[in-house]
Amino acid sequence: MSESPPSPTPGELTGHAGKLAVAVARAHGVETMFTLSGAHVFPMYDGAVKADPPMRLLDVRHEQTAAFAAEATGKLTRTPGLAVLTAGPGVTNGVSAIAQAQFAGSPMVVVGGRAPQNRWGSGSLQELDQPPIVASVSKLARTLPTAGDVLGGMDEAFTAAGSSHRGPVFVDVPMDEFFNTAAGPAPTAPAPERVAPDPEAVGAVARLIGESARPVVILGTDVWADRAEEAALRFVETAGIPAITNGMGRGIVPGRHPLLVTKARGQALNGADLVVVIGTPLDFRLGYGVFGGKDGATPARVVHVADSPGQVSTHASLAASMHGDLTTVLDSLLAEVERGPRPDRSGWVDDLQATVRATTERDAALLSAEADPIHPARIYGELVPRLADDAVVIGDGGDFVSFAGKFVEPARPGGWLDPGPYGCLGAGLGAAIAARLARPSAQVVLLLGDGAAGFSLMDVDTLVRHRLPVVMVVGNNSAWGLEKGPMQMLYGYDVAADLAPATAYEDVVKALGGAGERVTDPRQIGPALDRAFASGVPYLVNVITDVDAAYPRATFGV
């Protein structure tokens, strides 16, 4: 199946296609290959094992977990994650994670196996033309038809995945060509891309801010992804503008900061005369870009700032917009704002801070609730004080994770992962694996709804085999809570919304080699969490919660 390798020239790399692909991945900062064993991609494993030093191979129990781990690696490290999936069902099992990466702007490269080119059309095992399946949910999807295409094609893939606007890239290589050899220039680390904003656009936004009496800034995931968190905090503090954070923007303005008004979100967005949205789409999470305007009031003017032109909203009515490297954008904008008028906004900030304090006081009762069955908020009343500043908290669920979004305020950026706007359950175990590898000394906490737990809990086996301690907390209300309440409201009944009562998920983890316990008394949540953090093993705390204590929401989020 292999050919004699061509003779390398100085500065060239030679070897089979798997070796070449691994070399490119390493040049782009990849440290771990996430995979589930498949013969179509054996050369990738050989390339990883024989690299100097070897590349870490992290094998899982379901390809979705490998792809979700690569997606989360992209979020956490801000360099593309790598998943290697065998042909056919291996690739299709990873499609949901690829779609999540596309929606969230997560840099990742997925390398798929492919049936041999020299038998294509003859009915080889798992013969499937995969790029058309993935094309609609990726930045780029293509086949690298020969071993000689791998160096350049993989470099293009990683460059595209890691460039604004970030996202997933898929390539597959025919099995026969994966084993063939080629030579080409040795890969080098790419230079970072920094696109400056249009100075006229910067000036226009600065003028709007200077005219505003009640501005609000929203900081989203792309601020973190673009490594602009320091510039964003500098902008908020120097300009004195209240801020709301979402997605991986959480923690950029740390919890308890006087200008963080996420707990006064409704008042801030309904009362603002200017909303500057930076690094997040104007989607269902932000009212599709319409703020205020109730009872005949004038809606807020809206500014959208993005990392690339394709991310600027086309459906919302915008007063201004700009795009570019977000550090450059924010620093340029701050310089213009400082040169312009600075209205006294102390009353606006004071009102929002008062609401934050009142909300915090009101939440205290829920966080300490002694209700039986347990109110899910009580879990966060016990968990939040136990989180270190560098903790990574992962949400995989519906109602239970909605409570987390309300009560968990990261002390630092890069410490919160959720599925993002795609809303895909089952991402949690992959994200937990990625977080433990990316942050080996940090607390890693995976928050699971009991519905979400059913998607991926078998990959606790992966945590155990690879000695990756993670604390898992299940909010177990024996229902699909995000569907049960709305269906009852619409129809007066619900179907297909109940799960088996009080399922012993802790026993699943024990059977796979981890540890865990069930909690039915709110006073035992804290001690159970202490045991979990001290255990040094994958540990699941299964908290039986009240199905009627649903997260209050104004819309279905669609």
What residue ranges belong to the model's regions?
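Active-site diphosphate/adenylate-binding microenvironment
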Residues: 18-22, 26-30, 36-49, 354-435, ...
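Conformationally flexible catalytic loops at phosphate/diphosphate-handling active centers
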Residues: 128, 144, 156, 160-211, ...
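Glycine-rich phosphate/diphosphate-binding loops that line cofactor/substrate pockets in enzymes
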Residues: 19-30, 72-78, 102, 160-164, ...
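Glycine-rich, acidic loop regions that bind phosphate or pyrophosphate groups
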Residues: 112-153, 175, 245-351
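Glycine-rich, anion-gripping cofactor-binding loops and their flanking helix/strand elements
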Residues: 75, 221-303, 401, 410-442, ...
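Thiamine diphosphate
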Residues: 42-117, 121-126, 265, 269, 271-283, 313-315, 321-323, 402-480, ...
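Phosphate/pyrophosphate-binding active-site segments
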Residues: 2-12, 148, 184-186, 299-397, ...
